[in-house]
A protein has these predicted regions:
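Beta-sandwich/jelly-roll carbohydrate-recognition scaffolds of carbohydrate-active enzymes
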Residues: 2-152
Length: 153
């Protein structure tokens, strides 16, 4: 299973063999976060949601896009319309916000399972007082009901 932190996105398709069904991220790197947001997109043909962190981070490019819905008419560049953000989530423990800006990321891993269409994440944060908290999430865009996206945290 390829670890994308160790590879460039150039030639990624060639690196993922036919037997490989997931891509992984083994640590959080703020400089590569937007690239991973693109790679960890979940979608079902009707809508797609970028693979941003649930709690957000500085510089993120969040977005949920609907197939066939565009902004612009008779203009040179037609853009996809950004639908409402259904991922935005604030996680607090004892009044301290858990995110990559406020806490130290002790462990972080994500995997996009292509076979099941699920994005999985596990992050361990250390807050400024040294307490450790593990955050896990799953998300998907349903093929059974293409209007449905779901997230479990």
């Amino acid at each position: 299973m390829p670890d994308l932190n160790e590879r460039s996105s150039v030639g990624l398709r060639d690196e993922l063999g036919a037997a490989e069904w997931q891509i992984t991220e083994s640590c959080f790197d703020a400089e590569k976060a937007n690239t991973f947001e693109t790679l960890f997109t979940v979608g079902n043909g009707r809508l797609g949601t970028r693979g941003t962190l649930e709690e957000g981070h500085v510089g993120e490019v969040s977005g949920t896009f609907l197939s066939g819905v565009y902004d612009g008419y008779r203009v040179p560049v037609i853009d996809l319309v950004n639908a409402p953000d259904w991922l935005s989530l604030g996680v607090f423990v004892n009044g301290v916000r858990l995110d990559v800006q406020s806490c130290t990321v002790v462990e972080h891993e994500r995997a996009l399972d292509f076979r099941h269409g699920v994005l999985w994440r596990r992050t361990v944060f250390a807050d400024p007082e040294g307490r450790r908290t593990q955050l896990e999430s799953l998300r998907f865009a349903s093929f059974a009901d293409r209007r449905l996206c779901a997230m479990r945290v």
